[in-house]
């Protein structure tokens, strides 16, 4: 789901998602990170 992390590209979300969900699957959507 969406996490409270601002982003400009999906790479910024990989680390953030790994911290939150343990998964590096994520993308930047509307300047906010979405983790899978």
Curated annotation (Swiss-Prot):
The site (Basic residue of the functional dyad) lies at 27
The question of whether Secreted is a record keyword is answered with: yes
Q: Signal peptide location in the record? A: none
Location of the region described as Interaction with Ca(2+)-activated K(+) channels in the Swiss-Prot/TrEMBL record: 26-33
Q: Where in the cell? A: Secreted
Recorded GO MF terms? ion channel inhibitor activity; potassium channel regulator activity; toxin activity
GO CC terms for this protein?
extracellular region
Keyword annotations for this protein, in alphabetical order, are: Calcium-activated potassium channel impairing toxin, Disulfide bond, Ion channel impairing toxin, Neurotoxin, Potassium channel impairing toxin, Secreted, Toxin
Major localization class: secreted
Q: Which Gene3D superfamilies match?
A: Knottin, scorpion toxin-like
Q: In which tissues is it expressed?
A: Expressed by the venom gland.
Q: Does the keyword Transmembrane apply?
A: no
UniProt domain comment = Has the structural arrangement of an alpha-helix connected to antiparallel beta-sheets by disulfide bonds (CS-alpha/beta).
Its family remark reads: Belongs to the short scorpion toxin superfamily. Potassium channel inhibitor family. Alpha-KTx 16 subfamily.
What's the name of the protein? Potassium channel toxin alpha-KTx 16.5
What phylogenetic lineage does the species belong to?
Eukaryota, Metazoa, Ecdysozoa, Arthropoda, Chelicerata
């Amino acid at each position: 789901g969406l996490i409270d992390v601002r982003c400009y590209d999906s790479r910024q979300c990989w680390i953030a998602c790994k911290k939150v969900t343990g998964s590096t699957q994520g993308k930047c959507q509307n300047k906010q990170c979405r983790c899978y």
